[in-house]
Amino acid sequence: MRDICAKTQRDTIQRSMPITKCQVVLVCAIICNCLILFYVSHVQNINGEWFEQSRLAAIKQKIAFGKTKNAAEPSRQFESEVTVVFLEFEEFENDLPRTIRSILDHFPNIHVVVISRKRPYPPLELPNGKIQLVVQEIQPDQKQSSGRPENYITTQYVMFVPDSVRFDSTSLPVMMLSELKAMASIKPQVKVVAVPVKTRMAIQCNNLAFDVKRWTLEYSVSEEEAESYYRTCDSVSPSQVILLKTAFLHSLSAPYMRPFPESVFIQASLHHIKTKLLHKMSFSPGFKLFTNAHTAWKFENNVKTRTNEMYLKLGVKKVAHPSGQVSWYGCAKDTGRCFGTVYDDMPEYLYMSRWTPPCCLNHLRETAHYLFDILNTAGVRYWLEGGSLLGAARYGDIIPWDYDVDIGIFQHEISKCSYLAEAEKHSNSGTKFIDDKGYTWEKAKEGDFYRIQYSQYNHLHVDIFPFFEKDGVMTKRTWFKTHRQDREFPASYLKPLETIDFVGIKASAPNHVREFLEFKFGKGVIENPQYPNPLKLKKKSIVKY
């Protein structure tokens, strides 16, 4: 009975609410719109697998087409717009003739320039064609212009090819050119296109930060998600073929510096220029080089020498690699420091708009640590003085452009430290005391104070000024008239001594540090960085970060 009632109720509702044609049409329209939106979303999803595979397949098809069809017109255009340059090769063993022949097989009228620092020996047996050997070290009877590669490159684009590469067709080089041209309007910051040479080594796409002021180069693995067929990088390694505009190449300070193209990537990073890496494409490798121990050693030694020369020219002292390893290219214990004699308290690097090289700062920190340990062990009280105390208050470290460390000690405690006693004794005989760690101790020639140097060759140092109390005032026997902070001060600032963060440790310092510094330097000295003698610089003296 209940089922019959329910059925009757449903029939009544259906009769009272009939489905109209408009409702049917509306429902169909909604369904169609949903299907269209789904389709459009699927097609336009540039990160989707379908788009990526389709785009890559199209490129591969284009390359395959070039291998089987006569692409005369694009080839002729490539020949007229591009110069092929060889810069990275070894004169004692190379695959240059075969590499050039493989290019001429596909681009018989291409202009090829081979650049060598000195005339190659044994002589290169280059094939016939439009090939120019440019020797950068010219003979006395030659014009200077004859050794300048830019005088032989007249095309709009230049392609750098490493040694021992094979061109299998015209299509990949032609595609590189079209990709570079397309970037001019789409991504103007991309001015280099790179294609790797097929090797067992994984291709690396790195970010690159060149801090010129701090002499530091920092690499990191690019975490940018790869596009369908390319990646955007600051630096690419290992071997690759690169294409770029000639005008951009010649706008760099050292366009033909080796190792290449790393030298270009470093310089380009200063202008925020990116490289488009076609990481799913590759050129075929040629003849395997440096297969015996002797030639491998010669090659590795040459690369090391060129790398050192490149960093010297670019002013790089510290390189942080993607692995976290750090390489140093500055001064050491057995070399001189990175800068010469300082005049007017202004080191030469300040006139270059640079700060203290990081290797020098590290050696100053090491020397300070070493000295503080010795003084603490001997029971000699010390405190940070002058710019070193200012650096501690402002940065917890040495001022980034400072070139030494200054401390004060109590004169009556000098005899407690055997190293200072040795320095005094050697000073009387006109020599310096070198301890068993290689540090050099001396009585300074400039006045009545002591100095510890990083080594007998590297004169980065800590100055040790003996003070004594007189009528409640700390004074000393030697003063520097050009240092406004070099003045007497109340002995109460040393009663008691406090500690402050400096070079990674807790160092001794006067009490009421801010008050002490403003007494010596002036109001607001901590918050207002300034070079020691700013009037010597034409630009503003206020330091910008």
State where each predicted segment sits:
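Short, acidic, metal-binding catalytic loop of nucleotide-sugar glycosyltransferases
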Residues: 78, 98-110
